[in-house]
Amino acid sequence: MIDSHIHSYYSKHAIGTIEEIVVSAIEKNIKYLTITDHAPFLIDKNNRLQDYELKYYFEDINTVQSKYSKDITILKGLEVDFVPKYISYTENLISDMNLDFLIGSIHFIFFENERINIWDIHKIHDEKVVSKYFLYLKELILSGLFDSIGHPDAILRGGIDEKIYYEKFFPLIKLMKLKNTSYELNTSGLRKSTYDINTNSENNGIWNYPCKSLLSTLNNNNIS
């Protein structure tokens, strides 16, 4: 079993040290584990690594890689926020990092006078937000910086039709093949609420992501 998206207490919204996470993964018979805490960024600084913590973060990963090498393969990674206008910041941040795996995720969508967060589920069904989200996805892939797209279908929490998501994402598959970018199968959507456009309410217990209808298409196109 493989887990390529995991956060420790370094991400501030998660709990557990890196070693505690590794021990738990071994108990669950996970054989490959990629530590991918949230990288430093220009905004939302309270939910991620701080610049000064990177040294300790990488040291902790090096320690568990050595200590548990007989039990599990541990990879060194980060989850990086992708915003086109801040791409130079991202390039500079990762330029001298010797990472095994890099996730690019879209958490923020910018307009002239507004920032929409991907967790603002009552806003992300808006047509202009959806269009810009897919523009960001395209630019993320074309940047060639990332091994995987983090939770690409998280926008389904906003209540948009899965068919719309499928139709908008399908043209990006050829770009993913060109750039050798993976599609993350993120199951956190199974425990998160979904916005109901008709009732203007959040509902639990409804499958929102991953996008079921897209999975077979990705598999048929050899997208991992």
Put a short name on every predicted segment.
Residues M1-P84, I94, G158, K163-E167, ...:
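An N-terminally biased module of ancient metal coordination in phosphate/nucleic-acid-related enzymes
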